[in-house]
Amino acid sequence: MVREEVAGSTQTLQWKCVESRVDSKRLYYGRFILSPLRKGQADTVGIALRRALLGEIEGTCITRAKFGSVPHEYSTIAGIEESVQEILLNLKEIVLRSNLYGVRDASICVKGPRYITAQDIILPPSVEIVDTAQPIANLTEPIDFCIDLQIKRDRGYQTELRKNYQDGSYPIDAVSMPVRNVNYSIFSCGNGNEKHEILFLEIWTNGSLTPKEALYEASRNLIDLFLPFLHAEEEGTSFEENKNRFTPPLFTFKKRLTNLKKNKKGIPLNCIFIDQLELTSRTYNCLKRANIHTLLDLLSKTEEDLLRIDSFRMEDRKHIWDTLEKHLPIDLLKNKLSF
């Protein structure tokens, strides 16, 4: 962080993108300004945005690869220049763009001799490769080479224990961090009581989203993080009332779930994804972050479970109920669900 004295003043609070460029397919840069801020506010905003940009933005990446009968990740495959470990590292670097949630399947199936690049990955329709020229492996002989891949949207850095999988499947340490770097600087303006600060924010991304998109998502995540405090204030509920409040279960479904499964005419809840419901993006994202992907996942939760989800509110609870009423038969809801 840098502090400098500069001349000039800004009369109204505003933000603006002062510079934007594409250095390469996997390196985008953006520079933003926010002013005027009172003394100390620029640090508050800068620190919060930097942490949210680096740790809260979701990204899509390859999390697992299956090679077939490969004894361990340090093995070599006849006709391929790279070892299995080198191929895994190359797959880890592939940058993907997608709004999908949950685990999706992809694959590579080519015949040598030839170079294998990211362009050779067969992806689901809504997943896009940012840089198709990223290298994966070099086939030096006329062999058939196939890999089954798993793709997941997540946030942060996820590691898995290394095991020798008998089926040739190996985990890839997932780096779901579209924002590569963030820097902010603070400039002081004015004199005396009119002194204020200007915040400059620099963002570098990997090309799966623009710096402006990253800034928007980080800001939205911060707002969602503080909404519970605002909601509590609007309700006028004291801490003591909240502490002693008993929360009844949203869905008393577990005891009756067996009967529903036995009913041949029942709805296959594990085949209904929440993507198919008309949920708001806010409610949808809350559920996805909690690994709730199907209607069965949702109905297996109590209200206490849902309210423990980050940014989940009572309004989301009502919205879910209204949505279920719209999509499921009323008699099924009355018989199987209760508040």
UniProtKB/Swiss-Prot annotation:
One of its GO terms (cellular component) is DNA-directed RNA polymerase complex. It is found in: Plastid, Chloroplast. Its main location: plastid. It comes from the Eukaryota. Keywords: Chloroplast, DNA-directed RNA polymerase, Nucleotidyltransferase, Plastid, Transcription, Transferase. The keyword Transcription applies. Residues 1-233 are annotated as: Alpha N-terminal domain (alpha-NTD). It catalyses: RNA(n) + a ribonucleoside 5'-triphosphate = RNA(n+1) + diphosphate. The keyword Ribosomal protein does not apply. GO terms for biological process: DNA-templated transcription. Residues 264-339 are annotated as: Alpha C-terminal domain (alpha-CTD). Its EC number is 2.7.7.6. DNA-dependent RNA polymerase catalyzes the transcription of DNA into RNA using the four ribonucleoside triphosphates as substrates. NCBIfam families: rpoA. The N-terminal domain is essential for RNAP assembly and basal transcription, whereas the C-terminal domain is involved in interaction with transcriptional regulators and with upstream promoter elements. In plastids the minimal PEP RNA polymerase catalytic core is composed of four subunits: alpha, beta, beta', and beta''. When a (nuclear-encoded) sigma factor is associated with the core the holoenzyme is formed, which can initiate transcription. This is DNA-directed RNA polymerase subunit alpha. The gene is rpoA.
